[in-house]
Amino acid sequence: MQSLEKRFAKGLGWGLIDNFSGTGINFLVGILLARQLTPEIFGIVGVSLVLVSISTTIADAGFSNALIRKSEVRPIEYSTTFLLNIAIAGAIYAVLFFSAPLFAAYYRIELLTPVVRAMGISILFAASAVVVKARLTRQMDFKTQAIASLTSSLVSAAVGLYMVYHDGGIWSLVAQQLIRQSLYAIGLFVLTRYSFTFHYSHAAARELFAFGSRILFSSLLTAVYNNLYYFVIGKVYSPRQLGLYSRAEQFSLMIALNFTLVLQRVSLPALTKNKNDGQKLESVFQRLYKFSALLGSLFLFSLAAMADNFTYVVVGKQWMPSAPMLSILAIYSAFPPIIALHQNLLQVRGESKLFMRLEVLKTFLSACIVAIAIWIDFYTLLGGIVLIGVLSLGINGYWGSKFLPTYKQFKQIKDTLYYFLISSFVAFIVFLSSKLAITPSSKLGIQIAVFTLISLFLFTFVLKGERQMLKQIVRPSVKNEEQQ
């Protein structure tokens, strides 16, 4: 029987493999597609993905978090959740299908109708996999999820690239997204060999929905809050501007989203195991907090410093207007991984009502800031996004720290500022190092080398304690995997 720490370490290790391999493949494919397609096409797909993302959140109905959070889950609760998710997903897709022309009229993009209808099919596949993913997460089995994710990413990438080089246009992106989601769901069923007993319990549904409904509302607000800019930019500006923003955001989220997803998937069950022991809960939370604040800011601040050369080398001259957007969004992206930890803390403490209220407050503040900034100019809007990140961390940190014995918000702010200052210093050196070369590719190469050398120096001589902490958190034990 493995200790929680060893299981957590393995979980985080496989979670990293899952997210970084899957997202890494899609990142590379996205680069190749961006060299063949225009920003306008990416803008259309970006709007479609937002609509599908919000619809998928509704289809989940908060049940996945409810299943993970429960101390024990009966078979009838799994089968009830599966049936509910499929039914809700079917209804949501029907609404999306018939409302697609309305969105096309709103954005004045006729092509949006068939694209939204096609990409919406992925909602059904995502809903069918909710229960299997929840069971695997409860067992901290992220290896199975990683295998399914890697396989689906490779196959969908191959299809997408084949289509784009054979004049597939926008449908190359649509096919890639659909195939990835469908194969991932099918892969989970095949690997787990899980079969459902199609039984339904109204009592079980009512119990799960009591908790899940609050998480659903909060998750829906979060989805709208995270994608609010897509709706606004696409309407107020143009599909091209939205496509440029989308590309910059995807580059910045390559790091931030992976950290956030891994921490949410792994920390939720780990924190749940210790929810009745305040000291252990705080110990796990504090290590994860430092982990996300340090690594997130270190990589993202340096990415902001490399934005010009990175954009030119990776996706070409036509995407250069997105470089300053990337610099700003990379700084903002250091905040979501830390915020996600506080959200998990509230969930494991059973504070779903507070969770929901905080999401309402943050969404309201975000809407106010966007409503003001959008009419000034585009870069004021981006500055407003960074302000939203700071305020969101402050709000979640204030209320989340109330459930920790000694690691209060003041200590968290000190840790955050300490790691952000170190990361800012590294980013400044990385920025200056580009002056040593002439061509963008050589500048980028020097910047990456300088970032790597400085990071190694810091972890070897300055951040020794943090290095040990990262080893304890990240390194999965192969020996323990064999013993499980």
Question: What is each of the regions a protein language model found here?
Answer:
Residues 5, 9, 66-75, 125-148, ...:
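Membrane-interface junctions at transmembrane-helix termini in multi-pass inner-membrane proteins
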Residues 11-26, 152, 173-180, 184, ...:
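Transmembrane helical elements of multi-pass membrane transporters/channels
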Residues 398-401, 409-412, 428-484:
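Membrane-proximal transmembrane or re-entrant/amphipathic helices at the cytosolic face
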